[in-house]
């Protein structure tokens, strides 16, 4: 993607992220995302405007779409997944004998690290199934940006061990053995960590589009202003959202 060069004075003049008199700034309008990572992505969209005409139109189309789905997981679940994936304790390849040898110890003694691993693995499995369903059920008339995201989900799931996880946990509620949890944990936090980050980015994209759509409806903003390829244009009736 290509971006417009924007200096600090322009940000200040437009009151993008702060104002001299502690008045409302533009980002505050769009900061009510459902997730922390969604909020960071929204800030990125606002701070780094695109110069890529095709990508601008894709974003416009996605924000304007009235059929944007609910987020597939709630904020607490997504925060826990992020915490789990960033957790660096006890990352090791699974071994049947080691998994079996620690079963009794894990039953008798509470282990906070084991709790993070077990819940993290189960939430990631839930995430994979939710994304698989979303990608399969996406409407044919969905915006191009959503279609590209669904295609990325399908490519990642079908082209890696994550697809095998989906097949092996098709019931989702099936009880996982200690060895299976250890095996998936190494896969999620090591082997396929970057793939999972890419999958999570789809949810944050949905969050940003849903938030921008909601604000546009509430404030009667135009979601799809006309975009032209040249500098030969004029605009009338445009004001800063906080100009009274």
Where are these predicted regions, by residue range?
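An accessory alpha-helical subdomain
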Residues: 188-191
């Amino acid at each position: 993607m290509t971006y417009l060069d924007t200096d600090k004075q322009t940000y200040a003049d437009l009151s993008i992220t702060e104002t001299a008199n502690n008045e409302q700034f533009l980002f505050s309008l769009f900061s009510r995302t459902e997730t922390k990572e969604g909020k960071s992505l929204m800030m990125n969209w606002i701070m780094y405007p695109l110069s890529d005409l095709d990508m601008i139109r894709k974003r416009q189309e996605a924000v304007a779409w009235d059929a944007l789905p609910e987020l597939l997981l709630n904020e607490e679940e997504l925060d826990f997944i992020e915490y789990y994936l960033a957790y660096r304790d006890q990352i090791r390849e699974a071994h049947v004998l080691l998994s079996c040898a620690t079963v009794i110890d894990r039953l008798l003694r509470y282990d906070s690290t084991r709790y993070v691993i077990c819940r993290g693995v189960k939430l990631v499995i839930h995430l994979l199934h939710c994304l698989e369903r979303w990608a399969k059920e996406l409407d044919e008339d969905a915006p191009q940006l959503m279609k590209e995201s669904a295609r990325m989900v399908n490519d990642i799931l079908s082209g890696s061990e994550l697809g095998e996880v989906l097949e092996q946990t098709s019931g989702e509620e099936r009880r996982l053995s200690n060895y299976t949890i250890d095996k998936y944990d190494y896969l999620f936090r090591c082997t396929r960590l970057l793939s999972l980050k890419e999958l999570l980015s789809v949810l944050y994209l949905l969050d940003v589009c849903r938030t921008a759509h909601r604000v546009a409806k509430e404030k009667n903003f135009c979601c799809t202003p006309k975009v032209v390829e040249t500098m030969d244009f004029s605009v009338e009736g445009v004001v800063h959202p906080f100009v009274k």
